[in-house]
Amino acid sequence: MTRTIAAAVFPTLTEPLRSRAQLRALIGDEEAWRAVFEDPLGHTVSAMVGDDVAAGVILTDALIGTFATAGASDLRQNRCFLYHVIGGGTGDWHVPVGGMGAVSGALEAAARAAGAELLTSTEVLGLEPDERGAGVRFSDGDGERSVRAGRVLVNAAPAELQRLLGAAPDASAPEGAQLKLNLLLSRLPRLNDASVSPERAFAGTFHVNEGAEQLQVAYEQAAAGAIPALPPCETYCHSLTDPSILGPELRAAGAETLTVFGLHMPARLFAADPDGARAAALAATLRSLDSVLAEPIAGCVMRGPEGEPCIEVRSPLDIEAELRMPGGHIFHRDLAWPFAEHEEQVGNWGVETDHPAVLLCGAGARRGGGVSGVPGRNAAMAVLG
């Protein structure tokens, strides 16, 4: 079912927007259409999958970074699921050799080769669009300056764009719902199940306490204002897939990286006491991870020069403070369907704003959502006409 949808939908992401009816006809499978585009995903999964753990693993693609139940009527979980399963037309995920730094470096090199001037340590203060283009006010070490352009492509969240335009914020602010951990390990931990080697277990996505019932309990606890007692989380060991992300000395020492992504950690849980809530969420998440290990993960964490554990933890509020992603929402806002929801949007690129000279090129665009690069390409196509 998902492969049918992926094969039909993925190629359209880099084309002008189709209407809902056109995309439905393109998919050509009414059962698949209803399951993902019309019925709450939880209902579909419950009907098709009898095992609680298997159902939960499927649902994580719908709930990661999205604070919702599997049966939410607004279908935000369905939209999140859709973008996770259509990648490459197959749903397969890939990581760049050399890590995201290699991607950034390649983008920089291409931009400079094309004659671009890149400014760092620079804060954009405001945008002033008019019928001839747009002005951009910014500050750097030399004070406040401004430039004009025929088109301005904005990689910030839509809510941040509204602020830069001097417009009133929307009533419904985005809210992120994740806890992100990055750990540097001296080695991978042993599992409770001794028949599975750590290298095999951590080579893909490692799901921890993510059964369907566990996901629902965690949501209910978070919705009631409490950090989940046993947070659902999943891990990715990117250094197993691509050892080049570590330096030669760390590779020789057998070190590994471990990224842990915790679900159902909405920004509201951190508002009253950001530091205390972050510490509590970290402790709860490590306990959750330890529950499937034969040894505490803390014993495998490397230490810095002053003995501090090599653990980076970021709550939604940390993400907002450091990157100005409103509410710490990893998708900049709730994901949108990959089709035009109004007739006048058909044929657009999904990057347009109320100002012709200003386009979105980041995750908050229609068909956005993160590191795909699709919004940037579509914004470029909109400029090229």
Stretches with model-predicted labels:
Residues 96, 122-250:
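Mid-domain catalytic core of redox enzymes
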Residues 361-384:
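A conserved FAD-binding loop/helix module that cradles the flavin
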Residues 234-335:
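FAD-dependent oxidoreductase catalytic-site/capping-region signature
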Residues 55-71, 228-236, 295-366:
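A glycine-rich dinucleotide-binding beta-alpha-beta segment and adjacent secondary-structure elements
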Residues 153, 183, 260, 289, ...:
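Hydrophobic, well-ordered secondary-structure elements that form the walls
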Residues 3-114, 322-326, 331, 339:
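Active-site/ligand-binding neighborhood in enzyme catalytic cores
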Residues 74-81, 253-262, 354:
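Short coil-to-beta-strand
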Residues 110-124:
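A conserved beta-strand/loop element that lines the FAD pocket in flavoprotein oxidoreductases
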